[in-house]
C-alpha cells in the first residue's frame, strides 16, 4: 500500500479527453453556437451496453454550454428510450463507412443534429472524413479541433 501513494499523481493519458486546444474550442462554442445547437460528437464502446465520448466533445455540455448527441455517463439513468436513441446514433456513426451516406445523413437530420465537433483526442469523426462531404461545413479550426455546421441540404444540391 505504501508504494501506491507514490503513484497517486500518475495520469493515464488515455483518459485525458480535453486538451488546451479543446478548451479554446469550447470557449468559441459558448460564443458562437446557437443555444439550440445539437452537436454530434465522437464516441466509442465503453461497457456492455453503453458508449462514452472519445474526445472532449463528450464534455461540451459542461465546457461549451451546448447539447451533444451522447450525454455524459449518467445517460444510462435517463430512461430506456433516451439511452437506446443515443446508443443507436453513436453506433451508426462509429460504424459508418461513409459519413456522407444518405441513410446516415437522414438519421443525423432526423435526430436534430446541427453541428459536429472533432476534438484533439479524436475518434471516428475525423477532419479528413468530414471534409470529404459537403454536408459538413467547416466553421472553426484550431489545431486538431474542428466545429462543422451540419447541412445535409448541401449534399442534395450537388
Regions found by a protein language model. Name each.
Residues 1-158:
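Extracytoplasmic
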Amino acid at each position: 500500500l505504501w508504494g501506491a501513494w507514490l503513484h497517486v499523481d500518475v495520469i493515464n493519458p488515455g483518459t485525458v479527453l480535453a486538451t488546451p486546444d479543446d478548451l479554446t474550442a469550447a470557449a468559441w462554442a459558448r460564443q458562437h453556437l446557437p443555444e439550440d445547437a445539437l452537436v454530434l460528437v465522437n464516441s466509442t464502446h465503453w461497457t456492455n451496453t453503453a458508449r462514452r465520448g472519445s474526445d472532449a466533445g463528450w464534455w461540451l455540455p459542461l465546457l461549451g454550454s451546448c447539447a451533444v448527441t451522447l450525454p455524459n455517463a449518467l445517460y444510462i439513468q435517463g430512461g430506456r428510450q433516451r439511452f437506446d436513441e443515443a446508443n443507436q446514433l453513436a453506433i451508426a456513426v462509429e460504424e459508418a463507412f461513409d459519413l456522407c451516406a444518405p441513410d446516415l445523413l437522414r438519421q443525423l437530420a432526423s435526430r436534430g443534429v446541427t453541428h459536429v465537433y472533432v476534438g484533439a483526442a479524436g475518434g471516428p469523426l475525423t477532419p479528413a472524413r468530414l471534409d470529404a462531404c459537403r454536408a459538413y461545413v467547416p466553421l472553426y479550426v484550431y489545431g486538431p479541433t474542428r466545429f462543422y455546421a451540419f447541412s445535409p441540404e448541401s449534399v442534395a444540391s450537388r
